[in-house]
């Protein structure tokens, strides 16, 4: 695969590299190199040209709660337990409904793609079918994830 664009990446801690208007050649799953001019050996191969766009590496999120994405941005005025009781527990209980869960998971996975988060470690809910469906949809979306269920046995309602 060959890409052309403006690439920004960090090859080492504290180091930032910008490559403007260059070609990135990928062979298999590895970067074969960046080039100002495309080497003759790659002539005639298709090039994905991103124009003036900035191309960034994907992000990895190592700790997130997938079911809480539907209530993100609410309740910043509350401490943790009141926030859980007011917003999180009621919405997480709804994941027992597989139709609700599927729609929510699809929105969640679209958000991961939109944010450039292609790998993540996520908690689902205690609902087995919903958790399995999140795993299936994640794979279908072309994302990589470690997905587990929450094991909370204190300060949670009986529904969770």
Language-model features: where?
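N-terminal metal-binding scaffold of metallo-dependent hydrolase/deaminase domains
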Residues: 1-42, 53
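Active-site-proximal beta-alpha core segment in soluble small-molecule metabolic enzymes
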Residues: 132, 146-160
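A short, flexible beta-alpha/helix-coil linker loop
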Residues: 8, 90, 152-155
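Hydrophobic faces of well-ordered beta-strands that scaffold small-molecule active sites
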Residues: 58-62, 120-122, 145-149
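Alpha-helical scaffold segments that flank or form the walls of functional sites
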Residues: 72-143
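Active-site beta-loop-alpha junctions enriched in small/polar residues
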Residues: 65, 125-126, 150-155
């Amino acid at each position: 695969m060959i890409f052309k664009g403006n690439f920004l990446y960090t090859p080492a801690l504290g180091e930032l590299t910008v490559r403007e208007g260059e070609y990135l050649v990928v062979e298999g799953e590895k970067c074969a190199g960046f080039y100002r001019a495309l080497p003759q050996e790659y002539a005639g191969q298709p090039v994905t040209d991103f124009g003036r766009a900035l191309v960034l590496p994907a992000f990895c999120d190592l700790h997130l709660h997938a079911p809480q994405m539907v209530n993100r941005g609410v309740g910043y005025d509350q401490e943790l337990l009141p926030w859980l009781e007011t917003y999180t527990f009621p919405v997480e209980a709804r994941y027992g409904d597989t139709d609700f869960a599927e729609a929510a998971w699809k929105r969640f996975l679209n958000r991961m793609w939109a944010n450039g988060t292609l790998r993540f470690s996520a908690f689902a809910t205690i609902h087995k079918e919903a958790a399995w469906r999140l795993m299936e949809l994640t794979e279908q979306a072309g994302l990589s994830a470690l997905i587990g269920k929450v094991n909370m046995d204190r300060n949670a309602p009986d529904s969770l």
